[in-house]
Amino acid sequence: MNIHEYQAKEILRKYGVPTSTGLVVTKTEKINEAIDKLNTKVYVVKAQIHAGGRGKAGGVKVVKSKEEAKKVAHDMFGINLVTHQTGPQGQKVNHLYIESGCDILKEYYFSIVFDRSASCITFIASTEGGVDIEAVAEKMPEKIIKFAVDPATGLQDFHMRGIAYGLGFKDSQAKQMKEIVKSVYNAFIETDATQIEINPLIINSYKNLLALDAKITFDDNGLFKHPNITAMRDHDEEDPLETRAANAGLSYVKMDGNIGCMVNGAGLAMATMDIIKLYGASPANFLDVGGGADRERVKEALKIILSDKEVKGILVNIFGGIMRCDIIAEGIIAAARDIGITVPLVVRLAGTNVEKGKEILSNSNLKIIPAHDLADAANKIVEAIR
């Protein structure tokens, strides 16, 4: 789960991380009031959306008067902000965060992530802040420092020292950085986060460190322990189909292609998407119905896929282990009859009760295209939509 910048800063402040402060606005009629209340020399008006690249897209504006701030805020509120992470459709700005500006002497990058490949928590820091860390990693990898934290021992003094001195801090600033590392680590562990990113972390005119922007992502599986964090969820920032799927117990991610996929198992789902690309088309979604899906869940999965108007065909790829192929077949037929599937539908079944499943599909009198393996299925669905 993602949250907005202003919410991330609120959490970090509770753990002792110094951040820039401001006021959040959720209604246009509150804009002038917030700016008057802030009453500062420099205003920073920030669009609050769950996507990076806001600054380059015009979603962050620095102005030096109340009148300018009010105009910029009114112009920004409610627009569809398009960044390199939103896709061409953009994301509607329903929240603004208006801050007091400050002088920036130097920008840094600092984050903590759960590194799945290394099975540990990893700190990432760089003297090149305020830009995409991916660009830094590609062009100047020597500018990035990393420290892995053994989950058995947790954060140690050498981690804090290594990051502080690795970024070139000395004396009081090194002490501040070590405290920030400790605070961010504690926030990461105690909130069940998977990523906390501060970009940029700056030195201001008082020679103090300050988190100027912040992003936190949480592990959905840990949210039941944190009702206060769950309450921060902004459903307007999430794809309605993804929300609907989550409520139905389905793992669904919308993509940009036109072939809908329904698969059981994340690995098989990714392999299915790969082979669709290999045969010259693009998947419209990732959808894992899970190992224990019943007829109703299969039916709901197909309804969700067909709710995407870009879908021109559907590929169902099921390996029946825990899940029985006959149950899948019954769900497909029920969905087809209930909602009327008008796009080509290719079904590949393998595993438990596969022959029974194939028989059910064959006797349904529906226009279902059977496939005997994954390559055959991909080839048939790509040909069917051409």
UniProtKB/Swiss-Prot annotation:
GO terms for biological process: succinyl-CoA metabolic process; tricarboxylic acid cycle. PROSITE patterns: ATP_GRASP, SUCCINYL_COA_LIG_3. Residues 9-244 form the ATP-grasp domain. Substrate binds at N264, G321, I322, M323. Binds 1 Mg(2+) ion per subunit. It comes from the Bacteria. ATP binds at K46, G53, R54, G55, E99, C102, E107. Gene3D superfamilies: ATP-grasp fold, A domain, ATP-grasp fold, B domain, Succinyl-CoA synthetase domains. Keywords: ATP-binding, Ligase, Magnesium, Metal-binding, Nucleotide-binding, Tricarboxylic acid cycle. One of its GO terms (cellular component) is cytosol. It holds the Pfam family Ligase_CoA. It catalyses: succinate + ATP + CoA = succinyl-CoA + ADP + phosphate; GTP + succinate + CoA = succinyl-CoA + GDP + phosphate. GO terms for molecular function: ATP binding; magnesium ion binding; succinate-CoA ligase (ADP-forming) activity; succinate-CoA ligase (GDP-forming) activity. Its EC number is 6.2.1.5. Its cofactor is Mg(2+). Mg(2+) binds at N199, D213. NCBIfam families: PRK00696.1 (NF001913), sucCoAbeta (TIGR01016). Succinyl-CoA synthetase functions in the citric acid cycle (TCA), coupling the hydrolysis of succinyl-CoA to the synthesis of either ATP or GTP and thus represents the only step of substrate-level phosphorylation in the TCA. The beta subunit provides nucleotide specificity of the enzyme and binds the substrate succinate, while the binding sites for coenzyme A and phosphate are found in the alpha subunit. Heterotetramer of two alpha and two beta subunits. Belongs to the succinate/malate CoA ligase beta subunit family. This is Succinate--CoA ligase [ADP-forming] subunit beta. The lineage of its organism: Bacteria, Pseudomonadati, Pseudomonadota, Alphaproteobacteria, Rickettsiales.
